[in-house]
Curated annotation (Swiss-Prot):
Entry's EC annotation: 6.1.1.21
Organismal lineage: Bacteria, Thermotogati, Thermotogota, Thermotogae, Thermotogales
Gene designation: hisS
The species this protein was found in: Thermotoga petrophila (strain ATCC BAA-488 / DSM 13995 / JCM 10881 / RKU-1)
GO molecular function terms listed in the Swiss-Prot or TrEMBL record: ATP binding; histidine-tRNA ligase activity
Compartments, as annotated in UniProt: Cytoplasm
Name listed for the protein in its UniProt record: Histidine--tRNA ligase
Length: 420
């Protein structure tokens, strides 16, 4: 039987892995430079955690979660997003005892049963962070500023930040009523999902891809904000303008998770077609209470690694690729192998990537393999070289080679390689 990867998943290797390393390492550097700590949570949680946080009527809960019963009969779900697990960890481990203004970032796989397509997989990967404890618009500004910093550090430029405020639970009541009145007049024209959401979660009608043209003329949430939410939103825009972070106000933006309040935003890249959202986030001031904790203001963001990589490729951004087969040690015979291993150890201490042949191949076979793996240099050691106390350093691109005294080989090779 030939085993194949599950539909909606990917194997990542070769040159592709360096895109992942580039995104992940850039994200870590940006987060840690801003005082954000790493947190790691399990990839599966109690199903109820996501039902309560994401929303029972959301598409994620209704259609997309990977849910199963374990041997103890408990309902378990592979995490479809990263915020709820971080909040659960915060509450369970009493991290609030460390005080407010806490920041945590995460990197890892998420799971949703969706139709696989470019940039949308069933196992996908996210980078994200949460800022916990501040209700000030300064926190909202910091999140958006750091997202913008991260994307620019990657080299991306062809994206736009879409921004909206959907208000708090108090002012959103009037907004829902306005949407009910507007959509009630055209209910017969709406798709089946929108007809269902009309009764259960009317804000999600603004997010419908089928009936999006109706959303363009729908009432705007900003026109129904209470004084506090309006001040919060205006102050956020003031900060963004002061620091020249470009954004576009998008009054149809609500996001797909029910826990959002006030600020919501998305980052969309012009080179990705229909699936052009590469990051998004917002504020979720009520989520801690919903999950059994005290009232704690918080907000965060998540970015899809697969889509960010597509954006990097769309902009043809060159990424750093390390040659892990830079030097290939070719040995002929047992004594030569022992000396070759010792040489490799010494070169690795110098920070070089060094591979040693372990297949007992002939000289031609070892050199052929070194070429195939992309090695730049080969170090050749055989009985004759051992007798002379030398090694041969061959440049596999030019074919030039030089004999090097074994006693000085490590320093010579390290210096030679560093010049290229």
């Amino acid at each position: 039987m030939n085993y194949k990867r599950i539909k909606g998943t990917n194997d990542i290797f070769g040159e592709e892995i360096w895109y992942w390393r580039y995104v992940e390492e850039t994200f870590r550097n940006v987060c840690e430079s801003a005082g954000i700590e790493e947190i790691r949570t399990p990839i599966f949680e109690q199903t109820e955690l996501f039902v309560r946080s994401v929303g029972e009527e959301s598409d994620i809960v209704q259609k997309e979660m990977y849910t199963f019963q374990d041997k103890a009969g408990r309902s378990i779900t592979l995490r479809p997003e990263g915020t709820a697990p971080v909040v659960r960890a915060f509450l369970e481990n009493s991290l609030i005892d460390r005080g407010f203004q806490q920041r945590y970032y995460y990197i890892g796989p998420m799971f949703r049963y969706e139709k696989p397509q470019s940039g949308r997989l069933r196992q996908f990967h996210q980078v994200g962070f949460e800022i916990i404890g501040s209700e000030s618009p300064k926190a909202d500004f910091e999140v958006i500023m750091l997202v913008d910093t991260f994307l620019r550090k990657l080299g991306l430029t062809k994206y736009r930040i879409h921004l909206n405020s959907i208000g708090c639970s108090a002012c959103r009541k009037n907004y829902r009523e306005a949407l009910k009145e507007y959509y009630g007049q055209i209910l017969a024209n709406l798709c089946d999902d929108c007809k269902r959401r009309y009764e259960t979660n009317i804000l999600r009608l603004l997010d419908c891809k089928v009936d999006h043209e109706y959303a363009l003329n729908a009432p705007k949430s900003v026109d129904y904000l209470c004084d506090s939410c309006k001040t919060h939103y205006e102050k956020l825009k003031e900060y963004l303008n002061t620091f020249e972070i470009e954004y576009v106000e998008d009054h149809t933006l609500v996001r797909g998770l029910d826990y959002y309040t006030r600020t919501v935003f998305e980052v969309r890249h012009e080179g990705l077609g229909a699936q052009n959202t590469i990051a998004g986030g917002g504020r979720y001031d009520g989520l801690f209470v919903e999950l059994g904790g005290s009232s704690v203001p918080a907000l965060g963001f998540a970015g899809g690694i697969e889509r960010i990589i597509l954006a990097l490729k769309a902009e043809e951004i060159e990424i750093p690729i390390k040659n892990v087969h830079l030097v290939y040690v070719v040995t002929l015979g047992e004594k030569a192998f022992a000396d070759g291993v010792q040489l490799a150890v010494e070169l690795r201490k110098k920070g070089l990537s060094v591979d040693v042949d372990i297949m007992d191949r002939k000289l031609s076979g070892q050199l052929k393999h070194a070429h195939r793996m992309g090695s730049r240099y080969a170090v050749i050691i055989g009985d004759e070289e051992l007798e002379k106390g030398i090694v041969i350093l061959r440049d596999l691109e030019t074919g030039d080679q030089v004999e090097v005294d074994r006693d000085f080989a490590v320093d010579y090779i390290a210096e030679r390689v560093s010049k290229d």
